[in-house]
């Protein structure tokens, strides 16, 4: 009997609840139903707000539905699967643990059961592009790759289709990592900067959650860290296996680095020149960093020729400085992934001229002062919306250099109005970028929906 069969045998008489009846959880729910598990499908939405077909199919398959605002209260189950974005310390989940209920997640169980090598990426910025690059490198090299975590598809439902020679590549958030007790074979941390402080109790809690990606590794694991980032560099004391640094600013002894315009890799001080950074199709110096990160993760698995081929062809990921259209000489870009100041700074640096920027959104209780000097240098018109608009404006106006920089700051009611204002003020040769520096939850369920709406608005001009 294999590990998967043993797992399902161990929970055969357990009641298992899944939080959220969304597209990412449904394959997982049906996997457990098909294995004869007593499943409770839970969602904060009322039945009327959920697709009728989904509700009907779940009931027909034998799932019990627990719906509405109080769906987590007094759950009479043995195991709860929380969603990737659900706070581990949610009072209802704490109460469940106090009552002896097991609280876990798809990724935790997947790591326990996965038969193949795993590569996981976390960080405050650059996770998705780096994860996608790693998967693209490996696929181009000929590996069968399973992409999951925060991107791709749920991997636990397809666990029986994964072979030991495959490679699983996953993106992990701090919310997922905070409770994980198993680390991947290759851990990657892009950087760590203040983020999600509306959910994490302290910055230290956020940092420790990120560090959890590597603390359960063994001597035969690889850890890839950003030596240019003070916090990630500090993680080196917890590395148990091969320590690999990458750097945009300095040469390293073991890892990828930039030497002038040349991307290089030092393998125990033996340096290989890989390519000129100008070979990279993606715009922006932050994407050079993403390549340094991804190369450090796959070195020894992927040939240099494969790396160069991908660099020349890879067009990027949706919502990440994504070109939308050119209208009357004005270029529009969708950078909705910029949910933090550091991410917006990277987006601003990708262009060699001053921009018209659409910013603002949900308040994650992170400071905007670090954004201010870059905004003064790179933004000519800033159109702000959402709960953070005033805080962003205050940080910029109080920054040295604001007086005389010529920046115009405008407040709008919503994204529609922001696009209208940008369209009215932009002149031929201008660049308009949605780069909010904030999460989307004040108006959209996620940054993807915000980005899609922006593209719809721009394409309808």
Predicted regions and their residues:
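Phosphate-binding loop of NTP-binding sites
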Residues: 30-33, 72-75, 84-227, 231-241, ...
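Short beta-strand "acidic-cap" motif of Rossmann-like dinucleotide-binding folds
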Residues: 39-43, 147, 169, 245, ...
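N-terminal leader/targeting and accessory segments in enzymes
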Residues: 1-105
């Amino acid at each position: 009997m294999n590990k998967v069969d043993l797992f399902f045998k161990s929970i055969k008489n357990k009641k298992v609840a899944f939080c959220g009846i969304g597209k990412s959880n449904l394959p997982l729910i049906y996997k457990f139903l098909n294995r004869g598990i007593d499943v409770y499908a839970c969602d904060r939405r009322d039945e009327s707000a959920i697709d009728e077909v989904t509700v009907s199919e779940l009931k027909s398959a034998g799932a019990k539905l627990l719906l509405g605002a109080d769906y987590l209260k007094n759950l009479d189950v043995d195991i709860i699967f929380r969603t990737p974005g659900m706070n581990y310390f949610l009072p209802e989940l704490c109460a469940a643990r106090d009552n002896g209920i097991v609280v876990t997640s798809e990724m935790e169980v997947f790591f326990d059961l996965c038969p193949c090598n795993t590569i996981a990426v976390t960080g405050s910025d650059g996770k998705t592009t780096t994860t996608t690059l790693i998967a693209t490198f490996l696929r181009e090299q000929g590996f069968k790759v399973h992409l999951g975590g925060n991107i791709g598809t749920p991997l636990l439902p397809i666990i029986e289709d994964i072979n030991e020679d495959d490679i699983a590549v996953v993106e992990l958030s701090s919310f997922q990592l905070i409770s994980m007790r198993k680390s991947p074979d290759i851990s990657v941390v892009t950087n760590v900067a203040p983020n999600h402080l509306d959910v994490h109790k302290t910055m230290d809690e956020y940092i420790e959650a990120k560090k959890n990606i590597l603390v359960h590794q063994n001597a035969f694991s690889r850890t890839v860290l950003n030596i240019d980032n003070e916090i990630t560099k500090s993680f080196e004391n917890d590395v148990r296996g091969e320590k690999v640094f990458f750097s945009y600013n300095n040469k390293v002894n073991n890892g990828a680095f930039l030497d002038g315009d040349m991307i290089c890799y030092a393998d125990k001080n033996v340096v290989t020149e890989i390519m000129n950074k100008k070979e990279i199709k993606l715009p922006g110096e932050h994407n050079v960093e993403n390549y340094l990160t991804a190369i450090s993760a796959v070195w020894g698995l992927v040939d240099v020729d494969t790396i160069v081929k991908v660099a020349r062809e890879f067009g990027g990921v949706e919502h990440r400085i994504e070109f939308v259209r050119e209208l009357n000489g004005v270029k529009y870009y969708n950078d909705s992934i910029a949910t933090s100041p550091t991410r917006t700074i990277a987006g601003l640096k990708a262009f060699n001229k001053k921009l018209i920027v659409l910013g603002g959104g949900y308040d994650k209780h992170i400071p905007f002062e670090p954004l201010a000097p870059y905004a003064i240098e790179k933004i000519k018109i800033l159109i702000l919306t959402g709960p953070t608009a005033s805080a962003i404006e205050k940080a910029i106006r109080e920054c040295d250099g604001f007086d005389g920089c010529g920046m115009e700051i405008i407040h709008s009611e919503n994204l529609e109005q922001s696009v209208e204002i940008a369209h009215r003020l932009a002149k031929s040769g201008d660049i308009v970028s949605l780069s909010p520096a904030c999460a989307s939850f004040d108006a959209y369920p996620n940054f993807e929906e915000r980005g899609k709406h922006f593209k719809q608005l721009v394409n309808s001009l």
